[in-house]
Amino acid sequence: MKKGFFYVLLSAAALPALAQKVAYTEYKLKNGLGVVLHQDKSAPVVAVSVMYHVGSKNELTNRTGFAHFFEHLLFEGSENIKRGEFMKIVSANGGQNNANTSQDRTFYYEVFPSNQLATGLWLESERMLHPIINEVGVKTQNEVVKEEKRLRVDNQPYGNFVSEIMKRLFTKHPYNWVPIGSMADLDAATLEEFRAFNKKYYVPNNAVLVIAGDIDIAKTKQLVEAYFGAVPAGAPVVQPQIKDVPITKEVIDTAYDNNIQIPAIMAAYRIPGMTNKESKALEMGSAVLSQGNSSRMFKKMVDDKKNSLQVGSFNYALEDYGAYITYALPNAETPLDTLLKDIDDEIVKLQNQLISVEEFTKIQNQFENAFVDNNNRMLGVAENLAAGYTFYKNTNNLNTELDEIRKVTRQDIMNAAKKYLNRNQRVVLYYLPKK
């Protein structure tokens, strides 16, 4: 989700790293399900994945956490898969599986030996066609989600920092809350509300099925039709189109964390969504500031002045907006305002001076290497094809993204910083130990 100690990367079977065009076949079933097939016979592995265009932004303000809850609930079983058997079937057939939820989408996947392609398709079609949503499953997964929140958020140092930032950065838009949501909202929800959410969003016309790996295209098309062709379409899904109120005056606030001894200073700016070119320019700018030990903020604050234990900046890229976040943890008794000033000084430089050619070349190489590495696995290819289909309305985005990165100029980085990273456009958060 976030860089540094905030990022989590998914992985599957590794394949040779090649920056080459990803060929694919794309079509749509009569029920509206998008289908993308990518053949790669370099290893006997296949990734079967479904991305639903539903995340926490599709929730009601008093029923938050539904999308993440369904990430868990839809593993409970179906009319043809007994409760608790889903993952056992995957494991018994030599596979691995998981799912993850963001503010904008939910992504389910299995990675199997390629001779188990039909098993993966059957499992995902069962999840889509007739999942079992009953009181037993809801109660069970409610406890699972509560335990996850306790481990990853409530009892995790700095675990609430994203939530505290987002609820101040967004006042009208549903990015105001994070996917884990409110346990009180989940407790208050009825079985009928859960079933209605499933019926509305987990439908073929709100999803894309991506299969990547050692497959035969013609045979795979037949299997897709056999397993998914009869799934009925749902009502058209309309994504929320909510514009937040512009931030025109610096917001300064304080949050407290029971799990920390070292405070932090954070500043967040609302920026354009992930498909905007300026978002990529800002992401490259953040790399100049804090990616690696030779980055500007690290060298200045950790190495030279030694006033910080950790510093960072990152573009939290989402569909409708993004959040550009900077942070620092003090070394010894360094005042938080001193750290904020040091970060601000570096942002001012980014706004008023072109980064050096050497820095620019370095971050271009970093981004290109990350791009190649991310597409070095069948699961990475599958997820990126799904993201192109879902967010860019262009599955081929995977093949053009590297060119778009190369098109970003030093001037673009400076212009984007000038436009979006101003003090009157931000939220400053003093994140302190709770006394």
Predicted feature descriptions by range:
Residues 171, 179, 204, 208-273, ...:
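An aromatic/glycine/proline-enriched structural segment found at the starts
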Residues 1-22:
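Bacterial Sec-dependent N-terminal signal peptides
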Residues 76-77, 128-136:
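Short, polar/flexible loop-turn hinges at active-site or ligand-entry regions and domain interfaces
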Residues 73, 123, 127, 148, ...:
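Generic, well-ordered alpha-helical scaffold segments in large soluble proteins
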Residues 64-78:
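Active-site SXXK
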Residues 21-40:
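Short N-terminal segments immediately surrounding and downstream of signal-peptide cleavage
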Residues 38, 43-56, 65-69, 83-128, ...:
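M16 family metallopeptidases and their MPP-like homologs
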